[in-house]
Amino acid sequence: MTLAKDIASHLLKIQAVYLKPEEPFTWASGIKSPIYTDNRVTLAYPETRTLIENGFVDAIKEAFPEVEVIAGTATAGIPHGAIIADKMNLPFAYIRSKPKDHGAGNQIEGRVAQGQKMVVVEDLISTGGSVLEAVAAAKREGADVLGVVAIFSYQLPKADKNFADAGVKLVTLSNYSELIHLAQEEGYITPEGLDLLKRFKEDQENWQEG
């Protein structure tokens, strides 16, 4: 079993991912979605957590061998980033969604030197907007951001465009396509549900029609 499939299996088993193609969730953006993901749940399961963190370490060593500092996005990327940094014996920092409105007004907590080669850790990629804002903040502080790693991606076309436009490399441990096919194989969804989930990936606005 590949790592992507193994992680997808864990996410389904521990209910970090819910699939309801016939009774969709409503995202904050108002989009009706057949999937809901809460990767914070992974922290409660040592076997899953270890699989993810070891996967991150291997992925970073392969894709970003020059890394000098690990940064987690607040808040979901912080625990994973801290564990990765510990495993790799690297400095750790975290990036707030916006600067503090008191004290020193920091947006990055920790110490990042000018030109230090950074990898940013996120738990989930939907459109990529929030993590790319974190990347931009890190660059403003002088970091040399090599790329982003995440547990899971919805593989939305908008995310592909956003990362391409920003010139930021993205590496994810598992993804939507891997998960929905595994879910159908293991009986979490029907073949009809799989078709709906495939349609959502291609067209988030009109996937329920037709």
UniProtKB/Swiss-Prot annotation:
Q: Where along the chain is 5-phospho-alpha-D-ribose 1-diphosphate bound? A: 96, 100, 102, 122-130
Q: What does this protein need as cofactor? A: Mg(2+)
| Reaction it catalyzes | orotidine 5'-phosphate + diphosphate = orotate + 5-phospho-alpha-D-ribose 1-diphosphate
Q: Name the CDD domains on file.
A: PRTases_typeI
GO MF term set: magnesium ion binding; orotate phosphoribosyltransferase activity
Q: What is its EC number?
A: 2.4.2.10
Q: Which domain of life is it from?
A: Bacteria
Instruction: Recite the UniProt keywords alphabetically.
Output: Glycosyltransferase, Magnesium, Pyrimidine biosynthesis, Transferase
Check the record and name the NCBIfam families matching this protein. pyrE
The cross-references to HAMAP family, in alphabetical order and at most eight, read: PyrE
Family statement drawn from the similarity comment of this UniProt entry: Belongs to the purine/pyrimidine phosphoribosyltransferase family. PyrE subfamily.
Q: Which PANTHER family match?
A: OROTATE PHOSPHORIBOSYLTRANSFERASE, URIDINE 5'-MONOPHOSPHATE SYNTHASE
Q: What is this protein called?
A: Orotate phosphoribosyltransferase
Q: Which gene encodes it?
A: pyrE
